[in-house]
């Protein structure tokens, strides 16, 4: 019987959003254990090699990491398979570039460049709040941070803004109708809109209705909702397309229009 952790990941079993082709090898990089789940993260090697094209091979990625050029959420990471996930800030000191991992409307991680000013903070969803030993209140975020003595107004499903230098909470957004959110799971992954209402289903999943900037409405589970702004003012810069998913016909029309303008 096999003992211990799994160390390999076959290429065909890798998450679809990594966009690895099936025929270039047998294995895929298995993400290390870390703050994000295997199916919801992007190993650092794939980000540097396949997305940014800063390296051609895994060996080159290792050389980049070992020179301590790559920071994730303000901390140097030398592990090439470190799991980078939603809302993480990747900074490359040498080139002065900063990226935030957010989903595009196709449900893949977009290469989203941000300013040095924006790279100083990140948003985290509150997964749970509890009172620990000696009656110390704690909260746990979506990226496995445990923060003690939070503001007593912060509850589950709210979003907190964390200063990456100190790890302290600087501000928070309540989970409320009328606030801007991004969908982080399910069929509507990557869509951005304003929360219109929440249906409570005791014993089952609460359903949240969201309306995007084009006026299209859709519904998803509460667990898939990540609040990113108060009202319709987002606290982070949004990726291209602003989280509005086009239908196939709209995409085609947009392509044709772009072709005619260029032609």
From Swiss-Prot:
Coiled coil (residue ranges): none
Q: Which residues carry this modification: N6-acetyllysine?
A: 233
Q: Name one GO molecular function term.
A: RNA binding
Q: Which GO terms describe its cellular component?
A: cytosolic small ribosomal subunit; nucleolus; ribonucleoprotein complex; ribosome; small-subunit processome
Linked residues for Glycyl lysine isopeptide (Lys-Gly) (interchain with G-Cter in SUMO2): 230
- Subunit structure, interactors included: Component of the small ribosomal subunit. Part of the small subunit (SSU) processome, composed of more than 70 proteins and the RNA chaperone small nucleolar RNA (snoRNA) U3. Identified in a IGF2BP1-dependent mRNP granule complex containing untranslated mRNAs.
Q: What is this protein called?
A: Small ribosomal subunit protein eS4, X isoform
To which species is this protein native?
Answer: Monodelphis domestica (Gray short-tailed opossum)
Q: Which gene encodes it?
A: RPS4X
